[in-house]
Amino acid sequence: LAAGGTLGILIPPSIGLVLYGLIVGESIGRLFLAGFIPGVILAITFMLMIGIASKIWPGIAPKEEMVTWRLRFAGLVSLLPIGLLIFAVLGSIYFGIATPTEAAAAGVTGALFLTLAGNSGMLAISLVAGLVRRFPLLPRAVKTVLDDFRSARPVLPGQVRHNVNSMVNILKESFLSTARTSAMILLILMAAFTLQFAFAAVRISVDMAEWVAAFELTQLQLILVLVVFYLVLGTFMESYSMMLTTLPILIPVLNDANVDKVWFGIIMVILLEAAQISPPQGMALYVLQGARRDTDRELAEYEGVLANTGTINDVFMGVMPFMLCMFVVIGLVIAFPELAIWLPDQAKGGR
């Protein structure tokens, strides 16, 4: 859970890539495209690690009951509107139809519509079911599943008022959450640009670039040094703070070394992921430990026994194999830069 939760800052849409692009002046669309293939590879390595570990130690992943294909298909149908919305938002950016800001506005509007429709008796599912039933070639099982969705929630007394109150609460929480996130991003950007201006005014960035150039490092050597630097920094510093305080200094260094900033951005975001699960300061580790404690306490109360939650050291040890997966993917991206830059070059043209 801790490692999988970090995938969100690599697989688009990603706040981490947006912040990186704004700080270094890189195209958000190119960064989103660049993060797709490494993100999928990282997710696959996580799945392989889980599969191998569960074969070696079967007790860590007990087998669940088999789920019928009918239920699997029902789950896919319920995800169809969300999937189409994600495809529309990212696709409009990738194909140059809309800017990231325009696509974000369209995505918010679509998500709001789906949320309100879902709280109004699953209107979206009913519409999909009505359209699909017009095609006689579909299997009867498909139509049956969709009919089940339409009749799953009959209207009960007081349900309309409850749905209206629920919608109002959803809108309220959405607006507050958006305001908090937007304020956080704007404060980070304000601090980053202020720091960048201050470093430029006192020539710290220029002096740093000249100091690094004096070592006559190759591009590969420079990247490896930066990887080690960020791995060490991530053990005692929060990930976004790490990016905020170092990028303004590194931009001239990367420019002098002719480093592709899209390629380096993907490497850096994976390093930010590693920082989130790096002992002893990884934020995701403490979130997971808190969730473990709450879950164990609720389970113990249900069974009438004392809770026996493991220590944070168990979480530290548990994430080590997944950090190894991140190191493998970083190595692949360094060895094969095309993993990050091929897709944006194909979609938007090389530079």
Language model features with spans:
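Alpha-helical transmembrane segments of multi-pass membrane transport proteins
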Residues: 1-351
